[in-house]
Design a protein with these regions (language model features):
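Conserved substrate/cofactor phosphate-moiety recognition/catalytic segment
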Residues: 18-61
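A short helix->beta-strand "capping" segment at the edge of beta-propeller domains
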Residues: 163-173, 202-204, 345
């Protein structure tokens, strides 16, 4: 995760940045340390920098941030980043880069600059910086008319960094574990690219439940305890009966592309999402459907125009279905009608570039959401407030609280979701962290 403290010279970026990095135990970088000697001399002479002057400076900063990102290291950068094109250069993929604008009036900042000594930036250049400064629509705005310590605490709270956890590996050597579910005190999951349904026993050992002829997707159980599993490319759902797979529902005439995750409620109703398009071939994103399989009835579409419907959960009262729209970077809620139809669609949380995958509802109504493109599991309240972040060892794709007391979170992760790479690397893990 990268935090960029931005704004004009003299707004306290370096001071707040150092304190913030110390508070989070992250690395701190000051963009002033990356300026070329000729740029420092130019500013010291009272001449503002232009775009050409700043280009190599921004290139070096962007390369440095990219290296931190590749190594999954978190960093705080103090950088003016005055123009939108500068910010785009620093963060071509903004999902894991958070801009924080330390904002104050010209008069307040000028008074501070006039008292500053030992810096190459003269106070008379402040007006040119305000002239160059362009709004950053996605930035967190923090008013500088408060102490640096207060600003740090505001940033930490607003970015959901008051609670930061790190996971450890419980099991590894898997290909692509997905869809973790608890059943009879054991953790079941699919190892998708190994084409297996697996379970983890109470002692932490793994065993195979069944091999599948297709990529297995979501899991669930009917009220009588019969396990259901999605066959992704065949677009069907099978039941597991005495170690054999039996057809349960054919969705091939309804699903736009490969089926994916599935949610089965206590009444035996199953909702199934699908890709909508050929993800791994690089096709253009297209909307998909959510399909309902009612007990003893024919499958039917109950929601359309959903962007890559993925992980799902149902609220404790059974009245609301929550679904991750992965490549829309949002979580959506529907009311559930008596017949299973989904109505009154609304945004539960806008994740602002983070892609939600598997998710799980906590007992208090908050959500744990795996977001693979930022390598974090987010703890969310409805409306999008981030209550906490889990930094995982691998790329997280799904998660579920431990049973029965929800004191731990189990996370399925891998280094890649590409089928060939997943089979070769066997980087899949079950990770775990305490959440209480």
């Amino acid at each position: 995760m990268i935090i960029v403290l931005m704004g004009v010279s003299g707004n306290g970026k370096s001071t707040v940045g150092r304190l913030l990095a110390e508070r989070l135990d992250w690395q701190f970088l000051d963009a002033d340390d990356f300026h070329l000697p000729q740029n420092i001399a130019k500013m010291a002479s009272g001449t503002p920098l232009n775009d050409d002057d700043r280009r190599p400076w921004l290139d070096q900063l962007a390369e440095t941030l990219q290296q931190y990102s590749k190594q999954r290291k978190s960093v705080v950068l103090a950088c003016s980043a005055l123009k939108q094109k500068y910010r785009q250069r620093l963060a071509p993929d903004p999902a894991n880069v958070h801009f924080v604008h330390l904002q104050g009036s010209y008069e307040l900042i000028l008074s501070r600059l006039e008292q500053r000594t030992g810096h190459f930036m003269p106070a008379e250049l402040l007006r040119s910086q305000f002239t160059d400064l362009e709004p950053c629509p996605d930035a967190l705005i923090v008013n500088i008319n408060q102490t640096p310590a207060a600003m740090v605490e505001q940033i930490v709270a607003r970015l959901g960094l008051n609670t930061v956890l790190h996971s450890t590996t419980l099991a590894d050597g898997l290909m692509f574990p997905e869809a973790p579910r608890w059943h009879d005190g054991e953790l079941w999951f699919t190892d998708q690219h190994a084409r297996q349904v697996m379970r983890m026993h109470r002692d932490g050992t793994l065993s195979k439940v069944i091999d599948t002829p297709d990529l297995p997707g979501g899991l669930g159980w009917l009220p009588d305890g019969t396990a259901l599993v999605v066959m992704m490319t065949g677009r069907r759902v099978c039941r597991i009966n005495e170690g054999q797979l039996e057809d349960y529902a054919d969705l091939s005439g309804l699903a736009s592309f490969h089926c994916n995750d599935m949610l089965v409620d206590r009444h035996g109703r199953a909702w199934v999402g699908n890709f909508g398009y050929d993800l791994h071939a690089g096709a253009v994103v297209k909307p998909a459907e959510i399909i309902l399989i009612p007990p003893g009835g024919s499958p039917r579409v109950v929601a359309r125009n959903v962007i890559f419907p993925n992980g799902m959960a149902i609220t404790a009262d059974g009245n609301t279905l929550i679904v991750a729209e992965t490549f829309a970077a949002r979580i959506t809620a529907f009311d559930i009608c008596a017949d299973g139809q989904l109505v009154h669609r609304r945004i539960w949380a806008d994740l602002k570039g983070a892609y939600p995958d598997g998710l799980s509802l906590a007992a208090d109504g908050t959500l744990w959401v795996a977001t693979p493109n930022i390598n974090q599991v987010l703890h969310l309240r409805e409306g999008g407030e981030i209550l906490g972040r889990i930094f995982t060892r691998g790329t997280p794709y799904a998660c579920t609280p431990g049973q029965p007391d929800e004191t731990q979170l189990y996370i399925t992760s891998a280094e890649t979701d590409d089928p060939d790479e997943a089979r070769s690397l066997k980087s899949g893990r079950i990770e775990i962290t305490g959440i209480r």
